Regions:
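Structured catalytic-domain cores with a bias toward divalent-metal coordination
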Residues: 7, 13-242
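Secretory targeting signals
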Residues: 1-7
């Protein structure tokens, strides 16, 4: 009999922190995330949109050499199912944001179906957030990709501070919620915006929630397909921020 098979319930509870007892997945409605762990660092990483394959590859490789916990959505599509509808997974971190996303993506969704989807998200949201959000002064790094439709120019009007060291490359930039992190990044050759204040509109994104809760959060945006640049910026960010 193996040692694990012979353990008592008390031993399982006492030693449940062992790596082979840690969950490998966590879900909220139809958004299921693979969990990659390396070492003991409390740093968190996130890939929230399944169609951003450049970011997926960059983050997966990064976790081979850097400590922390990464959450990578399993879906290969941008949106995920919830009940009988679909939602943008980066709009599900608040009820208001989730409702707006559900209405936009599912124009024929009736009130009972809408409420059912919202309740499904309400039941599991805090459990997911407890896993994603670091404690204390820990850091969460999100690694998305963008296209021609989105750049740092979209964030400038709603940001508290802006540093554009690469105005000719608006698709590569950092978005952060902590002024100290912003100050460090602003000294670099990269574009960065600060969004610390609670926004007037709650769009359900993780950056808005992090700002609201005072969580250190950095979003690393790079154009889809530019893996070398995203790798460079992620390694640099990990080396410069405490």
């Amino acid at each position: 009999m193996s040692r694990a098979a012979g353990w008592s319930r008390r031993e399982f509870l006492a030693f449940g922190w062992f790596p082979f007892f840690r969950p490998k997945h966590i879900s909220l409605a139809g958004a299921r995330f693979n969990i990659l762990r390396n070492g003991r660092s409390p740093r968190r990483y996130l890939l929230v949109h399944g169609n951003e394959e450049t970011a997926r590859a960059v983050l997966t490789r990064h976790m081979e050499t850097h400590e922390g916990i990464a959450y990578l959505i399993e879906s290969q599509t941008r949106n995920v199912p919830v009940d009988t509808a679909e939602i943008d997974p980066n709009r599900m971190f608040s009820r208001a944001g989730a409702e707006a996303s559900l209405n936009r993506l599912n124009p024929n969704l009736g009130p009972p179906q809408l409420e059912s989807a919202l309740q499904a998200l309400d039941r599991g949201r805090e459990r997911l957030l407890k896993a994603l959000l670091p404690t204390g002064r820990g850091l969460l790094i999100a690694v998305p990709n963008n296209s021609d439709e989105y750049s740092v120019a979209d964030e400038q009007p709603i940001s508290d501070a802006v540093s554009l060291r690469e105005p000719g490359n608006p698709h590569a930039f950092f978005l952060c919620t902590d002024p100290a992190d912003f100050a460090l990044i602003a000294e670099s050759a990269y574009n960065v915006v600060l969004q610390q204040k609670k926004p007037v509109e709650d769009d359900g994104s993780l950056s808005r929630l992090a700002a609201n809760r005072g969580v250190r959060y950095v979003n690393l945006e790079v154009r889809m397909g530019n893996s070398d640049r995203q790798t460079e910026m992620l390694r640099w960010l990990d080396s410069i921020l405490p």
